[in-house]
Regions:
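Short loop/edge segments at beta-strand edges and connector loops
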Residues: 177-179
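Class I S-adenosyl-L-methionine-dependent methyltransferase module
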Residues: 45, 50-173
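S-adenosyl-L-methionine
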Residues: 1-32, 37-38, 42-43
Length: 179
């Protein structure tokens, strides 16, 4: 299972090194996994896939919008997938209309920054922006407004339904906390 987000500082490349340094308890006993900086969840989902003796996982992140995404994946996956499919359809429909495609992106960014939509739409906007912005960066200004420009992807995969379902199946095992 791959992360559903692109994330600067993601730990995917470190998994082999992390595995080499795991304590024996993780390999042979029951344990709780605590992820202090969940980000894309690369290590979290690797742990969930490879260590059936893990009794639970606790995820944390200072980014409350990111934690909202994980909560929605666990609690309302069908609504999230439906909204993401709608965003993807509309965005891909603008494939040969670059000016309109950019306008759509910036409208969604403005909607995200207003933070006055319901939590499912806010989570879908977070994922949409992550998949369509420049290099998948997450950057906010002092006003906590997401300010990354549109990326140059032709047809980004905004809704990976199968991967989202796999994440949803594991998300129930993870209490979510924001520092």
């Amino acid at each position: 299972m791959k992360p559903f987000l692109k994330w600067a500082g993601g730990k995917t490349q470190l998994i082999v090194e992390i595995e080499r340094n795991l304590p024996p308890l993780v390999l042979f006993g029951k344990f709780t996994y605590i992820e202090p900086f969940v980000g894309s969840g690369a290590v979290l989902f690797w742990m969930l896939n490879n260590f059936p003796n893990m009794e639970r996982a606790i995820i944390n992140d200072i980014n409350s919008d990111l934690i909202n995404v994980y909560k929605i994946i666990a609690s309302k996956p069908k609504q999230l997938i439906s909204t993401l499919k709608d965003f993807q359809y509309k965005y891909h429909d603008l494939q040969n209309k670059e000016a309109e495609k950019k306008e759509y992106y910036y409208e969604k960014r403005e909607q995200y920054n207003a933070r006055n939509t319901d939590k499912v739409i806010q989570a879908a906007l977070f994922i949409f922006l992550n998949r369509t912005c420049f290099n998948g960066l997450y950057r906010v200004n002092k006003s906590n407004s997401f300010n990354v420009p549109v990326g140059s992807y032709k047809s980004p995969r905004i809704c990976d339904e199968q991967n989202n379902q796999r994440h949803q199946n594991h998300a129930h095992d993870c209490p979510h906390r924001r520092r």
